[in-house]
Amino acid sequence: MAFKELTLNNFRCFKSTKIELSPGINFFYGKNGSGKTSLLEAIHLCSSGKSFKSSNLQALIAQGEDSFSLKSYDVDKGYILSVTKEKNKSISILVNNTKTTTSRLIREFPSTAIHNNTFSFADASPDFRRKILDRSLFVSDKSFLENWFAYYRCLKQRNSLLKSGSILNIEPWDIKISEEGEKLDLKREDFFKATLVELNILINTIKHSSSVNFLNDIIIDFFPGWDKSSELISIMTNNRFKDLKRRSTTEGPHKADIKFLIGDVDARQILSRGEQKLFSILWCCAQHEVLRKQHNINATLIIDDIKSELDTNTFDIFLELLNTLNNQIIFSCIDDHFSSKIESSFREFKKFHVEQLR
């Protein structure tokens, strides 16, 4: 999927704006408050039904207006997408004039957004890292959502029994949660391993290898949520009384995490903020490469305020990385760092001065 066009009506500071995007690299620049983040927010909303800035979509309606609308065109499948939000009404999502769900939106228009609240995956919560992994599985594996819901339904039932203070009827749920948990774990681990392969390929394409030594030092481990020297059913059975005391299920795929270490130390304690951000970008790109190569899915990478946290060295690595990627990339910055000479070296590059779009 690559967005070809985006039309904004009464969305934040944009009264009526139409943008033609490149299927490759798109760069938005302008001073603070010009609307850079709002444009990226609109693109993300078109691919998820959610804003990465506000949980209140009504706040996105331009001041003095009763609704906002976003329209976009997908170059790969020819889909016409319309997203509308009226005051005091639910969001309306149409694909080719047919009402659809946010689940289909995420699957048909996949994207990942990196912004100031999520720029470091190493510093994020385990829940956030699980969501990034699970979202890629959701868009690439039609059976994953069924597995995911089945596991979490079992988890809810088991936790309900634990909170009641009785484990007399817990055995059937131990069996069921273990069956569903093993399926969920297998899918996660397979995608994680594929992402590692693509990550190493991306790192090896960077010519200034001395500048990325820190990337080679990072050890990345997938923790399934329990000690896999034992089967999950054994963990559930052996943990019954401990879980009863804590009134919740203490181990399982709902506790899964991706851990980033240097030696035996958490990477966030060693890496600079710029190095953490660059690594997060690489990790997202690696996941997108798995989607593209193994599932023929082209996801869009959205990066707000690219220069924030990055120094000259890490920014130069990012520029080098751009030419190795095949998916659509949309990012913003306060200043224009791209001369005509640099622009000509990129594939399908488009640059937008945001003040001129309003």
Question: Can you name each region flagged by the protein language model?
Answer:
Residues 11, 15-94, 165, 169, ...:
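Conserved P-loop NTP-binding catalytic core
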Residues 1-31, 168-300, 309, 313, ...:
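Conserved NTPase motor "head" modules and their coupling/switch loops across ABC/AAA+ ATPases, GTPases
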Residues 1-2, 63-68, 85-90, 253-258, ...:
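A short, compositionally biased
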Residues 47-128, 137-140, 144, 200, ...:
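Nucleotide-state sensing region of NTPase/ATPase domains
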Residues 304-306:
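Walker B catalytic acidic pair
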Residues 352-358:
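Conserved P-loop NTPase catalytic core
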Residues 79, 120-209, 223:
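An accessory alpha-helical subdomain
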Residues 332-334:
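H-loop/switch region of ABC-family ATPase nucleotide-binding domains
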